[in-house]
């Protein structure tokens, strides 16, 4: 419930959908930041664990053109989101944009290509969910979902993003990397401990 209080929604005019995983009986609705209590914010609760389950629930509930994923320690760069959305608006054949994320203190979070490139099964293995923007209708039409056997919260805690992108490519969907920063994410994050003892 403390993590819900730390959520920082984007400042722009975005529709917000919050899915909270709560396999216990924790109270969290009273912890929502004021920005998430508005009429454009929709909340849902899953009584299960596993990030792939929550991401699939978000896809299922989403009624917007595009969807960007986040967790409690992500801060979005509104100008970057707008630029990526403008690209998607101009390129209706693209189902997924993979963009960049920065650290709050150390520049880009990892090495990225310096220019736009089409996603393949060979160049997508290091994707992070908070770098992805999906075209909801295409993802739903192609039946692409996160493999719930992978991702934080289950035994195979890595690989869910890569499988999602590979499944999209296999289904004939197009993904593109854009050198645009859309989010900041700390080096030590809420997901850093998954898979460690």
Sequence positions of predicted segments:
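Glycine-rich, basic loop-to-helix element that forms the pyrophosphate-binding segment
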Residues: 45-62
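Conserved donor NDP-sugar-binding/catalytic core segment of glycosyltransferases
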Residues: 79-112
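Acidic donor-binding segment of Leloir-type glycosyltransferases
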Residues: 4-44
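Short aromatic/hydrophobic "clamp" motif used to bind/position activated sugar donors
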Residues: 67
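Conserved nucleotide-sugar donor-binding
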Residues: 63-64, 128-145
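Active-site donor/metal-binding and catalytic loop motifs
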Residues: 152-153, 173-195
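Acidic donor-binding loop at a coil-to-helix junction in glycosyltransferase catalytic cores
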Residues: 151-164
């Amino acid at each position: 419930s403390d993590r819900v209080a730390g959520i920082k929604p984007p400042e722009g005019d975005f529709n917000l959908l919050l899915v909270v995983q709560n396999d216990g009986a924790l109270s969290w609705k009273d912890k929502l930041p004021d920005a998430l209590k508005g009429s454009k914010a929709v909340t849902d609760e899953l009584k299960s664990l596993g990030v792939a389950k929550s991401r699939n629930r978000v896809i299922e509930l989403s009624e917007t053109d595009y969807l960007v994923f986040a967790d409690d320690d992500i801060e979005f760069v509104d100008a970057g989101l707008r630029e990526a959305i403008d690209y998607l608006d101009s390129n209706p054949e693209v189902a997924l944009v993979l963009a960049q994320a920065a650290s709050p203190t150390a520049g880009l979070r990892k090495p990225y290509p310096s220019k736009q490139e089409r996603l393949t099964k060979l160049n997508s293995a290091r994707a992070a969910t908070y770098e992805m923007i999906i075209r909801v209708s295409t993802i739903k039409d192609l039946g692409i979902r996160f493999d719930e056997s992978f991702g934080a919260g289950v035994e195979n805690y890595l690989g869910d993003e890569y499988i999602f992108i590979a499944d999209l490519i296999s289904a004939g969907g197009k993904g593109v990397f854009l050198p645009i920063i859309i989010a900041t994410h700390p080096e030590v994050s809420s997901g850093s401990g998954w898979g460690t003892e």
